[in-house]
A protein has these predicted regions:
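Structural beta-sheet core signal
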Residues: 149, 183, 249-251
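A short acidic, helix-capping loop that chelates divalent metal ions and anchors anionic groups
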Residues: 153-158, 215-221, 285-291
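Cysteine-centered iron-sulfur cluster-binding motifs in ferredoxin-type domains/subunits
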Residues: 103-116
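Auxiliary Fe-S-binding modules of radical SAM enzymes
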Residues: 2-101, 117, 137-140, 167-179, ...
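Acidic/histidine-rich catalytic cores of soluble enzymes
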Residues: 189, 207-228
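Non-cysteine beta-strand/loop elements that form the S-adenosyl-L-methionine
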Residues: 144-150, 203-215, 274-283
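Conserved alpha-helical substructure of the radical SAM core
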Residues: 120-147
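Conserved glycine-rich "GG(E/T)P / GGGxP" loop and the immediately following alpha-helix
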Residues: 147-167, 256-261
């Protein structure tokens, strides 16, 4: 299966070992006018080596050909991908399989979350009326089966961008009716009417919205307009509006949370009826972003995987390099009863060297 997802990486190629992490210290201030909502003051460039399990492979042979073809399609249609904008460490793994995650409504966000590499501004450029057609054309040309479409926050628009998101998805469905669509949506500023207008009769398989971090860290990590409780409300309402859809969310770790807080956050998420969850390591994208507090070992991600399954999540991806849209099509298949997503270091997967073992019901080293 071929899928399509959105995030950005620094530079054209990524080395086998990912970039080092800088030691930074939070400063003061606020966000919303094109600058980061809270500045981070550098106290030095202590270059930490990432743990040994942080390795990924560059594409070769057929994978290199697919990577180049995906790059060409994105550029040809003037599209944005999360793969690039969010500096995703899996870009070569995904693009090497002919997949990408599309980011719509521009490449400038009205929020200033302290973990995110996407540019921010109070008044982003106006929406591109040709974007629905361009997006549909790119997805048709790439011949994918499961498309992930993510969005930037557009608090500058009365409906939060919902009508534009809908136009983009409908254009893709009309051009490629056989393609399964997953939307990774904003919180629409908590506007449930906008959420309803977006979701009613929308031809999608999965509605995803990320809680991002454990509740205690909201004020430290996310824009002041976002919160764990608001995100849960959006996910819960989405399920009420469209009980036929799979709902999905993601948690980043390494931001200062404890292991038990991750488990408790998963319990709260599952209590709202969320079907699918991903957990991955936070990596600092730049000098003005929150520094990494810790690197949980792969065995800890395996424990979270097991606990999430015991809670009743129908699909789980938990590993250091997992991101919310990683191998999304396979994760959707898992949620409908297929085998769990298998990720092995020997395949060049960017997840880790965790593999799923049916004998003990979870991921093992």
């Amino acid at each position: 299966m071929r899928t399509i997802n959105f995030v950005t990486l620094p530079g054209a190629l990524m080395a086998t070992r990912l970039p080092t992490v800088e030691a930074l210290e939070l400063g003061g201030s606020s966000c919303s006018s094109g600058q980061s909502s809270e500045r981070l003051k550098k106290t030095g460039r202590e270059r930490k080596r990432l743990p040994a399990w942080f390795k990924t492979s560059l594409p070769v042979g057929k994978s290199q050909h697919k990577y180049n073809a995906t790059t060409s399609s994105v550029k040809e249609h003037g599209l944005h991908t999360v793969c690039e904008e969010a500096r995703c460490p899996n870009i070569h793994d995904c693009w090497g399989r002919g997949t990408a995650t599309f980011m719509i409504a521009g490449d400038v966000c009205t929020r200033g979350c302290r973990f995110c590499a996407v540019d921010t501004a109070k008044n982003p450029p106006p929406l591109n009326p040709e974007e629905p057609s361009d997006l549909a054309g790119a997805i048709e040309k790439m011949g994918i089966e499961h498309a992930v479409i993510t969005v930037v926050n557009r608090d500058d628009i009365p409906d939060g961008g919902a009508s534009h998101y809908r136009k983009c998805i409908m254009a893709v469905h009309e051009r490629c009716p056989e393609v399964g669509i997953e939307i990774l949506c904003s919180d629409l500023d908590g506007n449930l009417e906008s959420l309803r207008s977006l979701l009613e009769d929308l031809p999608i398989r999965v509605f995803a919205h990320n809680v991002e971090c454990v509740p205690r860290l909201d004020n430290h990590v996310r824009d002041r307009r976002a919160s764990f409780s608001q995100s849960l409300n959006v996910l819960s309402e989405a399920k009420k509006i469209r009980p036929d859809l799979k709902t999905k969310t993601s948690i980043m770790v390494g931001l200062g949370e404890t292991d038990s807080e991750v488990v408790e956050a998963m319990r709260k998420i599952r209590s709202c009826g969320v079907d699918m969850i991903t957990l991955g390591q936070y990596l600092q994208p730049g000098g003005r972003h929150i520094p990494v507090e810790r690197f949980p070992e792969p065995s800890q991600f395996a424990d979270w995987d097991r606990e999430a399954r015991e809670m009743g999540f129908s699909a789980v991806a938990s590993g250091p390099l997992v991101r919310s849209s990683y191998r999304a099509g396979l994760l959707w298949e898992e949620s409908t009863g297929s085998e769990p997503v298998v990720t092995r270091e020997s395949t060049g997967s960017a997840v880790s060297h965790l593999t799923f073992s049916r004998t003990n019901g979870g991921q093992t080293i």
